[in-house]
C-alpha cells in the first residue's frame, strides 16, 4: 500500500510579498529534486511551494518532508507541530537542520543532516519498511552522477521569467566570513557529468532557467565545455559567479554565445576595508569598473549582490554605494543587511562580543530587520539606510543613469528594474513584529 508524502518548500513570510513582485524571481529546485528520488510504487507524492500555494493541513499524510533555512526555521517548526498533532511523521532537512541539528530534533521525528543524495533515498526506504532511525548524516561527499531529473511536473510554477532551474556544480573555493556554505556542504568542489546537465536542461519546458550553482565559473574548462554544449539549445539563463572570473574573455564569450542574460556577482561592498572584514579579498574595488565594462561588452547584465552593515561601514556607505552603482552602470542589485548566520565566523565573532540582539531566527533574513548591533551606526540607521538605498537605486532617475552606462539588454533591464521598484513600495514587514529585537543573546 502506498504511503502519502507531502514535500514542502516553506516561504519566509516576512519577505514573501516582496518576492512575488520581482519579475526576475526564480524557482527553488529543492523539492522537485527530492521528489525525483521517491519511488512512486511506494509513495503518493504531493509538492507544495508556499510561495504560491497553501499548505493542505486538512489532508492526512503519512510523512511530511520540509527543507529548512534559518530565516524560516520557526515557521517550519510550527508546520511540523501541526502535522504531528494530526498523526503524521515529519522529517526535516536543509541548511538550518545541518547547522543546528540539536535544535531541530525537538521539532520533528527524523533529521536529514548534510547533503542528501545518499541519505534521502535510504531514509525513504527505511520509512516505508517501518524501520527508519532518527538521524541520517551525510558522511562522505555524494558523487553527483546519474542523478534523477527534478519533478517539475508535480509543482505549480511561480509567476516569474526564470521558470526553470538546474545545478551543474556544487561548492565554492572561497571562505567568506558571512557565508555558511562550508558548514552545509562537504568542503570539496564537484561537477556533474556535462551530458547529464544538458539532458536535464533539455527537459525544461521554459526557455529561461537559472543555474543553481554557488560559483558557476569555478572550474573554467568544465564551464566552457558545458556552455558550448548549451549554445545549440537556444535557452536563456543566469548564474552566480565571482568577479575575478569575469575578467576572462573566454568565459564571457562562451556565456554570451550560450544565452546568458545576466550574472549574479557578489560585489558585497565598494570598500576594500569592508571586503577584508567580509573575508572577500578576492574582490578589489579598483578592478570593478574594468571587469563590469568587460561583462557589458558581451551584452550580459550584472546583478550585484550588496551587503550593508559590515563593521567598517558608516552612515555614508549608502550614498557612496549608490553613486558607485550609477557610475559603473550596475544593472540590478540584490541588497541585504548583513546577517550573522549560525556557525559562520561573523556569527561567532558577534556572539563573543555580545552584539547579537535576537534569538528568533525570523530576524535573520537580511531584509526586514537587524539581528545585531552595528559598530558605526544604530540598527535603525542601518535599516533606514538599506531601505532608502533600494528606493533610490530602483528609482527612474537612477535607472536612467545606470542604463546610460550599461547599454545592455534595455527592454529586459527595464522590466527587471520595474519589478523591483513595485516590490519595494511597501516594506514587507508584519505590523505586530518589532523591527529590532533588543533581547541580548548570551
Protein language model regions, located:
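Radical SAM [4Fe-4S] cluster-binding motif and immediate context
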Residues: 148-303, 308-310, 316-319, 323
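Structured beta->alpha junctions
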Residues: 68, 72, 96, 112, ...
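A structural motif corresponding to the C-terminal end of an alpha-helix
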Residues: 38-44, 291-302, 328, 392
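Structural detector of well-ordered beta-strand residues that form the stable sheet scaffold
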Residues: 91-92, 112, 135-136, 238-240, ...
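Acidic, low-complexity intrinsically disordered segments
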Residues: 2-208
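Structural recognition of alpha->loop->beta junctions
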Residues: 103-121, 254-264, 320-335
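Radical SAM enzyme core and accessory elements
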Residues: 3-7, 40, 44-47, 62, ...
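Flexible glycine/acidic-rich beta-alpha junction loops that bind and position SAM and/or redox cofactors
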Residues: 12-16, 103, 221, 273-278, ...
